[in-house]
Amino acid sequence: WQFTPVTYSLPLMYVFHKLNNQPLTLLKSSFLIFMLVSGFILSSTIPVFQLPNPGGRHKVGTHTFHWVDSLRDEHFTHEDTTDFREIIVQAWFPIKDIQELEPEPYLDFIEIRGSTMAAAAGLPSFLPGYLNYVTSNSFKSTLCIEKRMPVLIFSHGITGSRHLHQAMFEFLASRGYIVFAPDHSYDANITIFPNKKIADYRSEITGHPDSVNVRKMQMETRTFDISFILDQINKINT
């Protein structure tokens, strides 16, 4: 969208030329110049970036899991007694063959995720849309090169996301590590499940009269998330 001003300015120039045999007025000329310059400035200040090359000897595969802990009620939706804790966990790992595979996008569900990201940063809702054109260095796969490899679990910060540190995960995976990174539901900026159900951010404690105990409960939820992930990894490995 950064080139939208340029895209519209070109047909406008043609229309002005067809309707007027006389030179453009100063106002019209200034408007067209403004449109052209705006497009180039936007494309320079908000570029479609690329993640750095992981640099290791392995290609990087990725797979996203949706896991539900049926033994644990959802702490953040206590009003719904039928809601169990569910999380999205993405893994990055070394793979051999990437033939006929396309790199995965940097962010999934950008049409949903973008507006939430913009609101958190106080930006216009359309601004993160360009991230839809950013790809990662990871390829969708379930075939790790070996079954036994060192495993790391990365837990993001409050309002964070598993997506924010992908360059580091790809760096590690290309060097022989398997990295699991969850979105801690309701702690993350936004968690989007495969059916597009949303877990929004609900971990704000500013001004809460019992903030210490509330945060303690949230940290316990995260601890149980990690324990649950370890159990799921063991199941995958058997």
For each feature predicted by the language model, list its residue ranges.
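Membrane-embedded alpha-helical segments of integral membrane proteins
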Residues: 1-17
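Short substrate-entry loop that stabilizes the transition state in hydrolases
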Residues: 133-192
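Alpha/beta-hydrolase active-site loop
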Residues: 186-188, 192-238
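Domain-level recognition of soluble alpha/beta enzyme cores
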Residues: 41-152
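Generic detector of contiguous secondary-structure segments
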Residues: 78, 162, 166-169, 178, ...
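Internal/C-terminal transmembrane anchor helices
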Residues: 22-47
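Divalent metal-coordination and catalytic microenvironments
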Residues: 91, 172, 226
